UniProtKB/Swiss-Prot annotation:
GO terms for molecular function: structural constituent of ribosome. GO terms for cellular component: cytoplasm; small ribosomal subunit. Belongs to the bacterial ribosomal protein bS16 family. Keywords: Ribonucleoprotein, Ribosomal protein. GO terms for biological process: translation. The keyword Cell membrane does not apply. InterPro entries: Ribosomal_bS16, Ribosomal_bS16_CS, Ribosomal_bS16_dom_sf. SUPFAM superfamilies: Ribosomal protein S16. It comes from Synechocystis sp. (strain ATCC 27184 / PCC 6803 / Kazusa). This is Small ribosomal subunit protein bS16. It comes from the Bacteria. Pfam families: Ribosomal_S16.
């Protein structure tokens, strides 16, 4: 199963995340199938590749809880329904 989840990167205590599509059995920092965006919890900055995310969701990818809340804030699910 393909999941949309966060991949950690950055220095200690200055962490940020990439939003990626990867198989559910792949380790957290393993090689992703596709990078779909960026999230920095310190500054609350988010950059998303919305068309690619919508494509992955239509193909059946399941977002994790944290990614789901980020996508809800960015109103990606409204574009999925349209």
């Amino acid at each position: 199963m393909i999941k949309l989840r966060l991949k950690r990167f950055g220095k200690k205590r200055e962490v940020s995340y990439r939003i990626v599509a990867m198989h559910s059995t792949t380790r957290r920092d393993g090689r992703p199938l596709e990078e779909l965006g960026f999230y920095n919890p310190r500054t609350d900055e988010t950059r998303l590749d919305v068309p690619a995310i919508v494509k992955r969701l239509k193909e059946g990818a399941q977002p994790t809880d944290t990614v789901r809340s980020i996508l809800t804030k960015a109103q990606v699910f409204e574009q999925l329904k349209a």
